[in-house]
Structure formats: structure tokens, C-alpha cells
Amino acid sequence: MRYPVRPMETDQYPALIERALVYDVARETPLEEAVNLSARLGNRVLMKREDLQPVFSFKLRGAYNKLASLPADALGAGVICSSAGNHAQGVALAAAKRRVRAVIVMPVTTPSIKVDAVRSLGGEVVLHGDAYDDAYAQARELEASEGLTFVHPFDDPLVIAGQGTIGLELAKQMPADVSAVFVPIGGGGLIGGIAAYLKHARPEVRIIGVEPTDSAAMSAALAAGKPVTLDHVGIFADGVAVRRVGDETFRLCQSLVDEIVTVATDQICAGIKDIFEDTRSIVEPAGGLGV
């Protein structure tokens, strides 16, 4: 069942974010000082603790907002997504909360722990292909043949608005002297949503995106002036290993993001270590990217 994604103007996002229906399932996460890292750098570093969400990731926000915005007939038919990780779990939990069917197409190479996590949340797992692109193509076929609604991991204004509730929370939580927010970039939904709200509420704050050097799809898109498809992406930070960013997320980043930096694998590992030293939490590489 194909419900067209309604285009959104940039200045419409703040209101869409403020109306986002995420807190039935997500929680407002704390903004905590990284005491050890701050002392070492001689600068105050704050961390937004999205690892404390029910599925340990911000992805739940966008997935739930999308489902909560669908009409009853679409919910009755069910939803589908393609993902090898956090988006899959976010859609599965969101669907369980809304009591709707969720089909999750995952590559056959997906680690069993992630497959089991989706199944434990009630998702119907379909294993297909060796890579995300294969799973995505299969999901779009099943969307058409079974009358399901596809929940895109990033290139949908409702998903972007759900992720943008992090920006809404940051606007309330950040001290007045915060000068910059660093945001990991995969497909661009997280930074697009955060930038759309913070440039409205705290325009003086710089929004800086962070990508792995070997998966810098947004940097490539901005250099080309349009989304491009990378020939290859690294797999270390698999949560942000996207070959092509979204059309809408590209548009938002092009107009709202101040700067994008790229980091090597060694730097990502150092970020993971820094987070552990301050929180005793072990984050995945994509989670350590911003640090």
C-alpha cells in the first residue's frame, strides 16, 4: 500500500517536530557531561544519551512517528522496512506498540543477535541478499505485492521529524554557551532533523556532521551538488555505512549544516574508548563517531 511521502518545506519542520508522536514509546534522554573527556580537552563536552532508549538507539523516534501518522487502513495492512540493525528494531518495537504487522527484510549476512532481537520484538524477519541494497529491493517488492507501507530509514519527513525531537530536547537542555553540536551521519535523517530544529530555536549553534572517511556519502553529495552513489563503503561503522544519502536529507544538510568532518577508523575507536571511560557503556562505532 503506497502512501506518497508528502514534500516538506524547511520552515515547516519545527512545527512538525513539535507535534511528533514519539513519547508513547521513546523517552527524553539526558544530556550528560563527559567529565574525563572535558578535563582532558579543556572544553566542556556533553553527550546526548540515546543509548538509553528502549532499543538502545534514536531510530525508534522516527519509526514510531511514521507509524503513528499512518491512517488506519495502512496500519491494518502492516508495514515493512529493510535494515540490518537499529532501524529494524525501531520499526519492530513501534509496530508492536501500535499492534500492527511488521515485516523486516534483512541481509542474510546480518548477525544472528540482531535477527533474534527483531524477532523478540514481534517482527517477521525475511532474510534476503548479501547486502543492504538487496534487502531494500526485496522490501520494495514485498511492499507492492503484499500491500504494506514502507518505512524508510531516513528519507521521509515524518521519520526526519521523529529524529528531530532530539533537537527539540537539546534546545531545552543545552547551556547557553554551547557553540557546536556534532552529529553522526549515515543517510542523514538524524542530522537533518536536529539541524531543522536547532537552526530554528538556537541559530547561533553550529551544526557539524561527522562521517567515516570510508563512508562519506553526504560529503560526496555536497561536493557534487546532488546525492551520488558511492562505489564502496566501509563496514566498521556499519550503522552509518550508506552508499547514497536521501534526497530530502541532502536538501536539509545543504541548507542547514555548517560543516562536515570525516574521521578514520582509529579515531572512531578512540571515541568509543572515551565514551566508555566516562559512562562505562560500550557503544557501537556509529555511536562513537561524533566524539
Where on the chain are the PLM-derived regions?
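PLP-dependent amino-acid enzyme catalytic core
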Residues: M1-V291
